[in-house]
């Protein structure tokens, strides 16, 4: 696990060009960003595994997605020489329709339309429909389910606000394959006066 979570020293740790542009837009829109070190670490972890089915919960404006597309479907000639371990299917869950349009453009820019898709629903709707589909088709293999999410999930990245992160993480464990991976930012540690104990 330590190797999986360690920094990839052979990989350029600078922000990919497309992700950098999206980050600038986020700053202008006052949208909070994951720290660059966290985005790079998520990308580094994803470079070491070969997930069949992956999902990003909380696509936002596509900032973290751009980091992962740069890994899995590089568009520059320099990155084009690298071996990619992209998933067979990737679903990006984002309830904001305008953000979904931006993510859809990102998918097309990276020529990932045959394996990546954005779903314009909130996570609670997606998980409810998926669990319902699994329950009503209990006799068939998970991979044959007709659901928004490709099953079973081998990689889940939760990129939501701290208030929503815990509930999303708890609900996703039911869908993760044995040996699958769930990546999310740990809760912020309280600082200052915490009151009487």
What is each of the regions a protein language model found here?
Residues 157-162:
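Switch II (G3) loop of P-loop NTPases
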Residues 40, 63, 67, 98:
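Conserved SAM/SAH-binding loop-helix junction
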Residues 61-87:
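Conserved SAM-binding loop of SAM-dependent methyltransferases across substrates and taxa
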Residues 1-13:
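N-terminal auxiliary segments of SAM/dcSAM-dependent transferases
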Residues 7-10, 20-50:
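Class I SAM-dependent methyltransferase Rossmann-like catalytic core
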């Amino acid at each position: 696990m330590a190797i999986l979570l360690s920094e990839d020293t052979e990989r350029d740790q600078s922000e990919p060009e497309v992700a950098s542009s999206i980050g600038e837009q986020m700053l202008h829109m006052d949208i909070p960003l994951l720290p660059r070190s966290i985005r790079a670490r998520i990308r580094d972890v994803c470079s070491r595994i070969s997930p069949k089915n992956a999902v990003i919960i909380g696509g936002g404006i596509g900032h973290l997605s751009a980091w992962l597309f740069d890994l899995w479907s590089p568009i520059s000639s320099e990155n084009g020489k690298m071996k990619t371990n992209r998933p067979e299917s990737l679903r990006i869950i984002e309830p904001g329709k305008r953000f979904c349009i931006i993510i859809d453009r990102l998918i097309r820019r990276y020529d990932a339309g045959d394996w990546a898709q954005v779903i314009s629903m909130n996570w609670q709707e997606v998980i409810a429909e998926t669990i319902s589909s699994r329950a009503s088709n209990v006799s068939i293999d998970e991979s044959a389910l007709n659901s928004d999410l490709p099953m079973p999930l081998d990689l889940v990245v939760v990129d939501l606000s701290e208030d929503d992160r815990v509930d999303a993480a708890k609900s996703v464990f039911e869908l993760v394959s044995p040996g699958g991976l769930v990546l999310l930012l740990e809760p912020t540690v309280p600082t200052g006066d915490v009151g009487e104990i």
